[in-house]
């Protein structure tokens, strides 16, 4: 766990602090942070999602149907619970609630999935299976849903778009159609040659570092104030989602190792894609970025807890 913290979690904290202090010194402005996020959202993130999903194969997805169904139901359920809670309890707009759900209702499986699971459970087929399934659910299902929920409030004339126009608008975003296309290719059995990976990887490597740095810039542009909403987002991401995965997985008699990995994957900090989308559309940036920062620090405490609990009961 110490190796993971130093090698994977500490860099996130350091880069976010670097962005934060750069913002405080006005080396970069909040507008420049949005430009960084536009680069990530339109180019780096779609490339990263495409590469990560096409590494899977259809046999992986159907190898453990119960694992796929449990992950799908719980993650999508937590996504909508987060949206509903933010909209009803904290009186946010539909768009703000959509971004809240993308942050609090989605684990950062693409960036930290293998980094967390491999040192604990080994570089095995099972690890790849869990990461592939959850990655497809987060990137090919919840991101498109989130952008669809976000778009009705973002019409150019200030009026709500129709459901059809919102759907079309969401589908045009590279961060939506790239993972959906990758998932379709996986399901029909089309394998992208490994020799093509460098073509996508060069821009994809900019994804996480630039996104975390820009999150630090965004955090610097707003006064940090811990609130009940930030606590709610952190609780949902670090406690409620892994707890739901554990209980539903036990009820469905999942394989013990798969259950442990699924729970830990669900306990990961919020997906960076939510922060990128927040900054890109200038929606829910302050609370969303603060929720990410608190969740990253909280994960240091909750990760060992979920490892212990899932091993104890599975």
From Swiss-Prot:
Places the protein is found: Cell membrane
Transmembrane segments: 4-23, 36-53, 68-90, 97-116, 131-153, 174-196, 200-222, 229-251, 261-283, 290-309
GO biological process, one term: transmembrane transport
Pfam family membership, one: Mem_trans
Membrane topology: Multi-pass membrane protein
Keywords: Cell membrane, Membrane, Transmembrane, Transmembrane helix, Transport
A cellular component annotation (GO) from this entry: plasma membrane
PANTHER family, per database record: AUXIN EFFLUX CARRIER FAMILY PROTEIN (PTHR36838), SLR1864 PROTEIN (PTHR36838:SF1)
Family: Belongs to the auxin efflux carrier (TC 2.A.69) family.
NCBIfam families according to UniProt: PRK09903.1
Name of this protein: Uncharacterized transporter YfdV
């Amino acid at each position: 766990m110490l190796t993971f913290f130093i090698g994977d979690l500490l860099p996130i904290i350091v880069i976010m602090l670097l962005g934060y202090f750069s913002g405080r010194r006005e080396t970069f402005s909040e507008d420049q942070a949005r430009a960084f996020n536009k680069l990530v959202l339109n180019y780096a993130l779609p490339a990263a999602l495409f590469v990560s999903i096409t590494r899977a194969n259809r046999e992986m997805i159907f190898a453990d149907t119960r694992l796929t169904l449990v992950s799908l139901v719980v993650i999508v359920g937590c996504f909508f619970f987060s949206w509903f809670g933010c909209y009803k309890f904290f009186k946010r707009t539909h768009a703000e609630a959509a971004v809240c759900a993308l942050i609090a209702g989605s684990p950062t499986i693409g960036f930290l999935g293998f980094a967390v699971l491999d040192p604990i459970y080994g570089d095995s087929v099972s690890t790849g299976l869990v990461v592939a399934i959850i990655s497809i659910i987060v990137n090919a299902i919840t991101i498109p849903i989130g952008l669809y929920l976000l778009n009705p409030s973002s019409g150019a004339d200030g009026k709500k778009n129709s459901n059809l126009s919102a759907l079309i608008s969401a589908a045009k975003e590279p961060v939506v159609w790239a993972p959906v296309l990758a998932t379709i290719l996986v399901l029909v059995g089309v394998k992208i040659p490994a020799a093509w990976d460098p073509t996508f990887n060069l821009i994809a490597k900019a994804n996480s570092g630039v996104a975390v740095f820009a999150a630090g810039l965004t955090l610097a542009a707003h006064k940090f104030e811990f609130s009940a909403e930030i606590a709610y987002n952190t609780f949902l991401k670090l406690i409620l989602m892994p707890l739901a995965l554990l209980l539903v997985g036990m009820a469905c008699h999942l394989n013990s190792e798969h259950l442990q990995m699924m729970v830990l994957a669900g306990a990961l900090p919020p997906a960076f894609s939510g922060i990128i989308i927040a900054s890109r559309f200038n929606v829910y940036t302050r609370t969303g970025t603060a929720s990410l920062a608190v969740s990253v620090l909280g994960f240091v405490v909750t990760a060992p807890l979920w490892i212990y609990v899932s091993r104890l009961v599975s």
